[in-house]
Amino acid sequence: MSAGEVERLVELSGGTGGDEEEEWLYGGPWDVHVHSDLAKDLDENEVERPEEENASANPPSGIEEEAAENGVAKPKVTETEDDSDSDSDDDEDDVHVTIGDIKTGAPQYGSYGTAPVNLNIKAGGRVYGNTGTKVKGVDLDAPGSINGVPLLEVDLDSFEDKPWRKPGADLSDYFNYGFNEDTWKAYCEKQKRIRMGLEVIPVTSTTNKITVQQGRTGNSEKEAALPSTKAEFTSPPSLFKTGLPPSRRLPGAIDVIGQTITISRVEGRRRANENSNIQVLSDRSATEVDNNFSKPPPFFPPGAPPTHLPPPPFLPPPPTVSTAPPLIPPPGFPPPPGAPPPSLIPTIESGHSSGYDSRSARAFPYGNVAFPHLTSSAPSWPSLVDTTKQWDYYARREKDRDRDRERDRDRERERDRDRERERTRERERERDHSPTPSVFNSDEERYRYREYAERGYERHRASREKEERHRERRHREKEETRHKSSRSNSRRRHESEEGDSHRRHKHKKSKRSKEGKEAGSEPVPEQESTEAAPAE
């Protein structure tokens, strides 16, 4: 089908507009829908490029583009009185139809080099933020929408087909940031409540700043001048963002949806000679500090002490290493020997120690408000730590240990004395039974002395055994006499005394006879020697 046939169709539809049959058949002006297949049949030799450019640059008023529901623009040809009356071929050649599918948001180029048409069709819905400046192309900051409905107002239950519930489906293809169906519903509900004003947002969150300072500060003057903070993310309450793509996200930025918190970071310099300590500082105005500490703030549970508030002023400050009272023994270790230090024992007159309690307590700085200590109700350090009982206990324990040591020493001394006595007795016995060394004149006399010593030892042992036997016998007889019943006590006593005296006399007599025999046997060799001398 050539371009001339198309022009004839347009001419016939315009020239016979008054015919009743054609009006009844075609309904008067009718739309000419030309498909993309006709563009391939156009003869390039019949139509010249300059005419196409003029036609595309100055389109007639009868051609209009209207956007359908699917976003495809359709060319609509309407007849006018001027076109219907003109019969010249030049006027017909000026009409040119551009055929093709136009997609939303992308530049379209005609088949014959016509000017591109860029249609940015946006569905109507709630507009967030400022709408004064219109952005060409796709607005990446605009909230998403599904079929013209804002993303947060879409009801997931309205979908008949839920592909994320199918087996093997990946939830990350349908929900971002780790959401699933249930958490997404809860998130949308919370955002809806925040927009309606039902969700309570803390008022102090607009002025809270969280600053993290790395490195230790040098002195108190430098601590007062904090480095300037860099605000990396600020979410105004009138603007609602669902989050930027990773390519356009600022480094270190945090997206907080529905919150109005300013999060900043302090970049501190690390000194070479100091340790790397991390210090978290909270900036808060002095007017926001509640000076009434009788009750905790309303956002703390009852019974839990607030963590960000300073300690109550009625407690004494904890002792530091430099100001603590000296010589307090740590738990589990005995104190140093000697009397306790006088600073630990409170006197009766004062009731306070002179060293620790006289110093002025430093006030607790918190923001711009300082909390002084109540010195009148603060008890003294010695009254808190009563060490007199501890010292008494330690002194008593030391005395007990000394007594035990003295007893052990006395026992050792008694044992040594007993040993010395035994040794002296043995020496005296040996001296009594042994002759003087001046008697030793010959080997024979030495031999004789040795025999005498041995005999004397045997004699001493035999006499000792006899004494033990007599003692046992007497003991047995005494036991027997006690159990006898036919004699009187006087007679028994008399007989026992007589028996004892008789035994003693007998024992002495036997002892004397033995000694006489030994003495008589010793001078026998001397008599023999004297008898042998005259015989010679």
From Swiss-Prot:
InterPro entries: Fip1_dom (IPR007854), Pre-mRNA_3'-end_processing_reg (IPR051187). Pfam families: Fip1. GO terms for molecular function: RNA binding. Residues 1-110 are annotated as: Sufficient for interaction with PAPOLA. Residues 397-432 are annotated as: Arg/Asp/Glu-rich domain. Residues 43-54, 80-94 have a biased composition (Acidic residues). It is found in: Nucleus. Residues 484-493, 502-512 have a biased composition (Basic residues). Residues 1-95, 212-246, 300-536 are annotated as: Disordered. Its main location: nucleus. Belongs to the FIP1 family. This is Pre-mRNA 3'-end-processing factor FIP1. It comes from Rattus norvegicus (Rat).
